[in-house]
Structure formats: structure tokens, C-alpha cells
Design a protein with these regions (language model features):
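Cell-envelope/glycan interface and biosynthesis
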Residues: 1-138
Length: 139
């Protein structure tokens, strides 16, 4: 996703919250629960993508946590590590990632890393912290 696309998505979500009666400050804060500011999205790296199935979209559904009830999403979570992907913003890890649970957001980290992270139930921040500790001990 380009920076311009991220800006459009971010501004649209802020506008939706403003229309619901939130102040600008509140609307921006609520938007940041699920979207990063333009220029700060993992999508800009080419390593992250949002995956939802066609029936979900055709039913007029948005990117929402309830997507995790879909068989297609459950299959992705079960097999993602075989292809080097992780579920980037996992349920229960919101305080660590700073982003709400997103069952549609996947990030490529490589097969070996993905398998390790899945086995140990780590999000990227925790994995990086482990690597940094390992590297500091080897100095």
C-alpha cells in the first residue's frame, strides 16, 4: 500500500469518527488503534498485507476482529508459518504492539522465524527483543 493510499485510509477513518461525534483528538486516537499514520505503515515495506476472503467483502463487511470466525482466516493462521508469515497484531498482544487485534494483517518474516514465533506465541516486537538480548550476550 502506498503512502498516499495510507493517507486516504487514515483520513477517511478519522472523518468517520468525526461524523459519529468524536472530537478531532478522539477521532485520531481511535483511528490509531487500527491504522498507523501515513509513512509509518508496514504495508509500505512490501512485507505486510491484509487478507480477507471475497464472500466477507461481498457481504459488505469491513476489516473487523470478527473476521477470525471465518474458515478461510482460520486456515491462514494454521498454515501461515509454512509460508513465512505471522499474524502481525495478535489477540492479547495489543499492549506490546500498540495496535488492536487484526486477524487480517499478515507479515512476512521468513519460514524459520515464522515457525519459531508461532511455536512460542511471539509477536514481532517480542521476537526482536529476544534477538537483541541474544546479540548483547554474544558480545
Amino acid at each position: 500500500r502506498t503512502v498516499d493510499r495510507q493517507r486516504t485510509n487514515f483520513n477517511r477513518r478519522v472523518d468517520e469518527y468525526l461524523a459519529e461525534g468524536y472530537s478531532e483528538e478522539e477521532a485520531i486516537a481511535k483511528t490509531k488503534e487500527y491504522l498507523t499514520e501515513p509513512g509509518h505503515s508496514e504495508h509500505h515495506t512490501g512485507l505486510a498485507l491484509d487478507i480477507v476472503d471475497e464472500p466477507w467483502i461481498n457481504a459488505g463487511r469491513r476489516l473487523e476482529p470478527e473476521y477470525d470466525t471465518q474458515a478461510s482466516q482460520q486456515w491462514l493462521v494454521e498454515t501461515m508459518d509454512d509460508y513465512g508469515f505471522i499474524l502481525r497484531y495478535a489477540k492479547g498482544k495489543e499492549e506490546i504492539t500498540g495496535i488492536q487485534y487484526e486477524p487480517w494483517h499478515f507479515r512476512y518474516v521468513g519460514v524459520e522465524n515464522a515457525r519459531f514465533m508461532k511455536e512460542h506465541e511471539l509477536v514481532l516486537e517480542e521476537f526482536i527483543e529476544l534477538l537483541e538480548k541474544r546479540d548483547s550476550l554474544s558480545r
